[in-house]
Amino acid sequence: MTWPPLREELRGIEPYGAPQLDVPVQLNVNENPYGPSPACIADIATSAAEAAVTLNRYPDREFVALRAALADYLSRDTPAGIVPEQVWAANGSNEVMLQLLQAFGGPGRTAVSFAPTYSMYPEYARDTNTRWVAGRRADDFSLDLDAARDLVKTELPSVILLPSPNNPTGTALPPEAVGELCEAAGDGLVVVDEAYGEFRREGVPSALELLPSYRNLVVTRTMSKAFAGAGLRLGYLAAAPEICDAIRVVRLPYHLSAVTQAVALAALRHAPELLGKVDELRVERDALVIWLRDEGCDVADSDANFVLFGRFADRHAVWQGLLDRGVLIRETGPDGWLRVSVGTPDEMAAFRAALTDVDGERA
């Protein structure tokens, strides 16, 4: 046996991770460029200190207060409201997704998504021994509903993963598409990943509105993006209570630390302030889309806090040229395309200047 005794299908695989480079302008992992205010920081510090007093004890494994606060927050996006029994949380959306596949995927079961899609999905499937099947999106990155429905009926997946807005394209799904796939899935789960949901354009609804109609629908969110809490690592979902109960079977004991719960509650108390920058980022995003198109780029419509643009004969050369000028973006998505996060006005000015310089050099 080869040492170490790693599972054979994992040998030679590089760990997931975007480059973490120390450059002046970092626009590669879709973080919120605006940190919390001094008042929010003070509340977080006080809350963490209070939690530290009882760190010799295990935390509330049912995180009752946090579930109630998350339910209140999510209720803004659906007339039916959300109750705490419909909420689950974990250490980032990554752990939420992994728990879903641990509970509802596994050997002999299939997970489906539609490429281009979030690059971690097949890894969740691999790590849970769930068969992975990827359909294709249309050329404009929208979902070909007829083809998607046919794939679901053919593969009979236990879990369908639908990011909306999609990463890396920024494309949002219409509610009719989500509803039709919920019906086509039968008893399979339809997981709508709304990590970037708060950035969607005016009039684009959340899949949360569909929860009363479909017992197999799950909607996931995160505090990493709009809440400027990437360092917090708190993801959560809304679903039927029986789905949340099922996840309890696979969760690790006391998986959410007392400090994580306290800090997340503090952040939720400052939700209006933390989300106040979302409108500014939307404006910056829409201006970026217009500018890139004026520069002759193909640009995907975006409801997220990033923009996918192309098409480049050698996208790596463009990425490297930007990096050489102190701007880090992401080399991801379909061949020939690049993804840039929306930053502050100064960061976007630096990106535009660098891309103009790179284009001039390549002309």
Role assignments for model-derived ranges:
Residues 37, 216-293, 297-300:
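PLP-dependent aminotransferase class I/II
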Residues 281-282, 291-325, 342:
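Conserved PLP-binding catalytic core of the aspartate aminotransferase-like
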